[in-house]
């Protein structure tokens, strides 16, 4: 019973996160922290622009609260909004900006390079951006852009690297955008992957059916 409840809560939080991700596009949504209290459920929303989460005269936050209560069966939801202090070090926000730029027709390479400069300029120890899908033409491929220090696998990668995956809907199809950031304050282990100061690009092609 405890395990079933735990799984149910995780699924619920994931659905709420997806709802906020869609609803709070203009707010620069990052993530939520959901905690149950004796009087209800406290949901802390982290975003680049808290004003968009609250809305004019609190209209948006009221709408979010009502939706959580009626459609997601959240008991007495209490929404608190916190601003992300360093948006260029938040992989969700960085990934969303990249996806939005791609949807507006910006070239993926220029967009990725610009994002990496902002991330590293904010003091990150390392950053990796992976763009996958039909970027041009009918053939799917994966483009990787990296700078700084990055741990790619094992426990250090899970503990030290913040990751996010976003989707960009283009005319040729859906493109995946993965962002990995190693923040300035992390303590690096002895074994790390050292990249040069130049942004590196790696292209990987995969088979895709011709339409």
Curated annotation (Swiss-Prot):
Keywords associated with the record: Ribonucleoprotein, Ribosomal protein, RNA-binding, rRNA-binding
Entry's Gene Ontology cellular component terms: cytosolic small ribosomal subunit
Entries under CDD domains matching the protein: KH-II_30S_S3_arch
Domain KH type-2 positions: 16-85
Keyword DNA repair: no
An example Gene Ontology biological process: translation
Single annotated GO MF: structural constituent of ribosome
Top-level division of the source organism's lineage: Archaea
Disulfide cross-links: none
Pfam families to which the protein is assigned, alphabetical: KH_2, Ribosomal_S3_C
Cited NCBIfam families: PRK04191.1, uS3_euk_arch
Function in brief: Binds the lower part of the 30S subunit head.
Known partners and oligomeric status: Part of the 30S ribosomal subunit.
Family: Belongs to the universal ribosomal protein uS3 family.
UniProt protein name: Small ribosomal subunit protein uS3
Organism in which the protein naturally occurs: Methanococcus maripaludis (strain C6 / ATCC BAA-1332)
